[in-house]
């Protein structure tokens, strides 16, 4: 419908209402007019939108050494694992930039399997890699997955988490990273194929095969089970990097048997056995994973295998104090906001590390131990103006004495130890 000014009979812009005399140009369309000013405004809006949604690509992929250096800022130890991950991730995104083919040579996808004990840094490494590359990242727990049609989560729900992490920008999600934890829990119950249905073990491995390799998956936007009458989000998993991690308890005896070392036997060199046992996981081969219960096709889609070592006492002490996000630094900053200086004695840090080793929780257990120690401190000190410094001693960690509190004049505040009723 043409818009005219009733008084002068002039044409008007259908968007802003300005007349032909008020603008430089008026462009006619079927039933509408648009002025040059509105065209310019629309162009700016479209360019801004396209700028946000332009093809997601990595112009400057950090080199493996650069990736390793950034990982060092957040993750203590695990040097071999960092090196393997840095190379694998660099090659993966270089492959994406090249379009998967260079001079008719097809570059295959390199998903990663991380094997290491609880609390050794598997999840943190994957999270930090995603942060370095600024790509969407999602964590999934393999234990909640079941084969399609059974109670539990479908494997497509993993992809939904990644899409949500990318704010439903599917193109960005298609170049993200998914970390699947507890992957060892979906091993089949025995090395031999089962004649009965294993819906949470081998069945899940079979269901994961396609998305690991690369496929166009249909994902329900609201999650949950699929049904025929709902809409789906289509996502190509070809360029999604999958990192699978697990503790793989029971894998070491399998490696020992392959290497010809007896698990139990007379005349064995016990000292040599202890030395070898520390590095057994680093000698893992695909055939060991097959014996553990992963199916051949699944192992074949995880070509990069890297192992993490159990963290020793010194590594745990370093984790408490050295990374940018170290737990001790966080508590020091929190108390600094209340005008109190927090100090942990070296022996106190070592005692915390020993407790984590005893609990066999690795780095993951450090926070819960420190939170237990710091609860009363964080409760009391914000209300006290006479405290300038708080020192956590080894006796505090052991539960024998309260922390040492120092006044502004440097004198120690005498405290009575709280006894449990």
Swiss-Prot record:
GO terms for molecular function: ATP binding; ATP hydrolysis activity; ATP-dependent protein folding chaperone; protein dimerization activity; unfolded protein binding; zinc ion binding. InterPro entries: AAA+_ATPase (IPR003593), ATP-dep_Clp_protease_ClpX (IPR050052), ATPase_AAA_core (IPR003959), Clp_ATPase_C (IPR019489), Clp_protease_ATP-bd_su_ClpX (IPR004487), ClpX_bact (IPR046425), P-loop_NTPase (IPR027417), Znf_CppX_C4 (IPR010603). CDD domains: RecA-like_ClpX. Keywords: ATP-binding, Chaperone, Metal-binding, Nucleotide-binding, Zinc. Pfam families: AAA_2, ClpB_D2-small, zf-C4_ClpX. GO terms for cellular component: HslUV protease complex. SUPFAM superfamilies: Glucocorticoid receptor-like (DNA-binding domain) (SSF57716), P-loop containing nucleoside triphosphate hydrolases (SSF52540). ATP binds at residues 117-124. Zn(2+) binds at residues 13, 16, 35, 38. One of its GO terms (biological process) is cell division. Signal peptide: none annotated. Residues 1-54 form the ClpX-type ZB domain. Belongs to the ClpX chaperone family. NCBIfam families: clpX (TIGR00382), PRK05342.1 (NF003745). ATP-dependent specificity component of the Clp protease. It directs the protease to specific substrates. Can perform chaperone functions in the absence of ClpP. Component of the ClpX-ClpP complex. Forms a hexameric ring that, in the presence of ATP, binds to fourteen ClpP subunits assembled into a disk-like structure with a central cavity, resembling the structure of eukaryotic proteasomes. This is ATP-dependent Clp protease ATP-binding subunit ClpX. It comes from Geobacillus sp. (strain WCH70). The gene is clpX.
């Amino acid at each position: 419908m043409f818009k005219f000014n009733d008084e002068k009979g002039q044409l008007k812009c259908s968007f802003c209402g300005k007349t032909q005399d008020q603008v430089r140009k008026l462009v006619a369309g079927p039933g509408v007019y648009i002025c040059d000013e509105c065209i310019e405004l629309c162009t700016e809006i479209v360019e801004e939108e396209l700028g946000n949604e332009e093809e997601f690509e990595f112009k400057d992929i950090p080199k493996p050494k650069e990736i390793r250096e950034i990982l060092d800022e957040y993750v203590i130890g695990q040097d071999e694992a960092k090196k393997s991950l840095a190379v694998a991730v660099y090659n993966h995104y270089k492959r994406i930039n090249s379009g998967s083919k260079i001079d008719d040579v097809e570059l295959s996808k390199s998903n990663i399997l991380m094997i290491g004990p609880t609390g050794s840094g598997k999840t943190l490494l994957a999270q930090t890699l995603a942060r370095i590359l600024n790509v969407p990242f999602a964590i999934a727990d393999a234990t909640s997955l079941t084969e399609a049609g059974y109670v539990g989560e479908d494997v497509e729900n993993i992809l939904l988490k990644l899409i949500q992490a990318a704010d439903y920008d599917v193109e960005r999600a298609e170049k993200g990273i998914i970390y699947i934890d507890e992957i060892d829990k979906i091993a089949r119950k025995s090395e031999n194929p089962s004649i009965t249905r294993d819906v949470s073990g081998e069945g899940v491995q079979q269901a994961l095969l396609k998305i690991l390799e690369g496929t166009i998956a249909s994902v329900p936007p609201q999650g949950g089970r699929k049904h025929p009458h709902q809409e789906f989000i289509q996502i190509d998993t070809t360029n999604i990097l999958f990192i699978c991690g697990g503790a793989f308890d029971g894998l070491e005896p399998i490696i020992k048997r392959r290497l010809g070392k007896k698990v139990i036997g007379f005349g064995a060199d016990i000292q040599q056995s202890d030395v070898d046992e520390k590095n057994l996981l680093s000698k893992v081969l695909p055939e060991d994973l097959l014996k553990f219960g992963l199916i051949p096709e699944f192992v074949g889609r995880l070509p990069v295998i890297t192992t993490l070592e159990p963290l020793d006492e010194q590594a745990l002490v370093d984790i408490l104090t050295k990374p940018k996000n170290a737990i001790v630094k966080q508590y020091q900053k929190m108390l600094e906001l209340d005008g109190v200086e927090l100090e942990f004695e070296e022996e106190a840090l070592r005692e915390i590390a020993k407790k984590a080793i005893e609990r066999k929780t690795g780095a993951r257990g450090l926070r819960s131990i420190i939170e237990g120690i710091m609860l009363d401190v964080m409760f009391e000190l914000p209300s006290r103006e006479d405290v300038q410094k708080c020192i956590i001693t080894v006796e505090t960690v052991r539960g024998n004495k309260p922390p040492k509190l120092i006044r502004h004049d440097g004198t120690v505040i005498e405290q009575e130890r709280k006894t449990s009723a």
